């Protein structure tokens, strides 16, 4: 096999691996995870003996869970009916009065991706029981459209407006993340097709075009991943922090799905670099050989 064909085959293999990793990342839900078990244990130690034994593991009243059946009284404040409830709706329904202490906040182990946010099973017995009985939803869809503003109890109007503006900005960050990832997959697929065509037609030209498409995919992936990180940071630093930030002892961080996306980015940049750099390297070698022959003559 000629060196150019070998480089093209290697680039095509890297790009196909990158495509598989990127599709895996997009369609899995383990981009970001939270684990409040350590926080829960510290809260239980601090209030030991204050609650009955069967209530020590409950951090959230049942009325604030995303229930499937008829909504509690507080949920009637939502315009458009109870169908808008999701795992985060307790933030808007409780008001600040119910969140005067960190241990009074409803915190459960969750994992989320681009499309859904779900509870982990097997970590908290209360949420496990409610999910198994069909009372609470295990997963809720992440919104990519702006819904009607939610009326918030016990929160000043200015703060309510700030929360709604933050929701709007967060929605834009999510759209940018999903949009650029979709474009990355489309451009990467085109690059793989062009790299395959290079084995049969205009090898030098098609290899160069495939390299440019691979590098463009890398740019789209970089924008998307950085925007996703910005959306997570923005969400955790929203006001009021008593509602949106996490306590210091809650473990949270990125999970394996986003690492698949970063590995995909590395593979595609390597593939694009090979396709772009090889023609220049080969030309340099040819020029050196010609100069060597001329000098001997």
Swiss-Prot record:
It is found in: Endoplasmic reticulum membrane. Residues 41-84 are annotated as: Disordered. Residues 68-79 have a biased composition (Low complexity). It comes from the Eukaryota. Keywords: Endoplasmic reticulum, Glycoprotein, Membrane, Signal, Transmembrane, Transmembrane helix. GO terms for cellular component: endoplasmic reticulum membrane. It is a multi-pass membrane protein. Residues 41-57 have a biased composition (Basic and acidic residues). The chain crosses the membrane at residues 180-200, 209-229, 258-278. Its main location: endoplasmic reticulum. Residues 26-179, 230-257 are extracellular. Gene3D superfamilies: 1.20.140.150. Residues 1-25 form the signal peptide. Residues 201-208, 279-297 are cytoplasmic. GO terms for biological process: negative regulation of osteoclast differentiation; regulation of cytosolic calcium ion concentration. Glycans are attached at residue 158. Interacts with STIM1. Acts as a negative regulator of osteoclast differentiation in basal and inflammatory conditions by regulating TNFSF11-induced Ca (2+) fluxes, thereby controlling the induction of NFATC1. Belongs to the TMEM178 family. This is Transmembrane protein 178A. The gene is TMEM178A.
């Amino acid at each position: 096999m000629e060196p150019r064909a070998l480089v093209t085959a290697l680039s095509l293999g890297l790009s196909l691996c990158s495509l598989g990793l990127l599709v895996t990342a997009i369609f899995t839900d383990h981009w970001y995870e939270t684990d409040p078990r350590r926080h829960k244990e510290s809260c239980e130690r601090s209030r030991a003996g204050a609650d009955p034994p069967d209530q020590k593991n409950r951090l959230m009243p049942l009325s604030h869970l995303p229930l499937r059946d008829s909504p509690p009284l507080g949920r009637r404040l939502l315009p458009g009916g109870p169908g808008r409830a999701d795992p985060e709706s307790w933030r808007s329904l409780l008001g600040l009065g119910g969140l005067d202490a960190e241990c009074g906040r409803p915190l459960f182990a969750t994992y989320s991706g681009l499309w859904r946010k779900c509870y982990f099973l097997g970590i908290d017995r209360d949420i496990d029981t409610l999910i198994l009985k069909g009372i609470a939803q295990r997963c809720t869809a992440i919104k990519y459209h702006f819904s009607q503003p939610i009326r918030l109890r016990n929160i000043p109007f200015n703060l309510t407006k700030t929360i709604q503006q933050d929701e709007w900005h967060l929605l834009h960050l999510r759209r940018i993340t999903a949009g650029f990832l979709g474009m990355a997959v489309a451009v990467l697929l085109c690059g793989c097709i062009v790299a395959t065509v290079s084995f049969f037609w205009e090898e030098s030209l098609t290899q160069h075009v495939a390299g440019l498409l691979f590098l463009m995919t890398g740019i789209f992936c970089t924008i998307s991943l950085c925007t996703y990180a910005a959306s997570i940071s923005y969400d955790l630093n929203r006001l009021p922090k008593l509602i949106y930030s996490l306590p210091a002892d809650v473990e949270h961080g990125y999970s394996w799905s986003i690492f698949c996306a970063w590995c995909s980015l590395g593979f595609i940049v390597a593939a694009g670099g090979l396709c772009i750099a090889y023609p220049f390297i080969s030309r340099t070698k040819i020029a050196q050989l010609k100069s060597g022959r001329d000098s001997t003559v």
